Amino acid sequence: MIIALGLVAGIVLGFITYRVILQQVPIRLMTMAEQRLLTMRNNASNIFFHGRAPTAKARQIVMPSPDLVYSSCVYDLAKGPLRMQGNLPPAGHYWSLSLYAHNTDNYFVLNDRELSDRRFDVTLHPPSSRVAENQTAVKSPSVTGIALIRMIQRREDDLAMIQASQQSTTCQPAQA
């Protein structure tokens, strides 16, 4: 009887540990990241904010690569789908869009090698929507999350080209 009770207690403790560590910790970390980014942006969601090359003192992304320039958007699909679009830097310059769910899962990635016309146009749909997913229609597993664009800056004079790409990038409600 004591062995059975110990076994049940071990299973219950294991389940609680699983729930806390593998499910709740990522959600809490993403909530903190979203709140930090929103606080820096006057609580504005669904807008891309563009950075420069990170420095040791000025960085918004955790452990950023020093040769990448980031644009980020805390998205909220509570009011419906969002359309993200813009121009990429010229061919030969790395660009990627990564979408992260509220539990930190990276559920979608698009990069410059997949976009021969150097333009991206992605509609992000809420979890409750019924949509055929492809390169331009993506269903988010959560209502909130983070969209992250990365562009490589090899030389100082690449920054003007990167900023032109950033200025063309938008995130706005999708038209029905």
Give each language-model segment a name.
Residues 1-176:
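A compositional/structural signature for long, glycine/proline-rich flexible linkers
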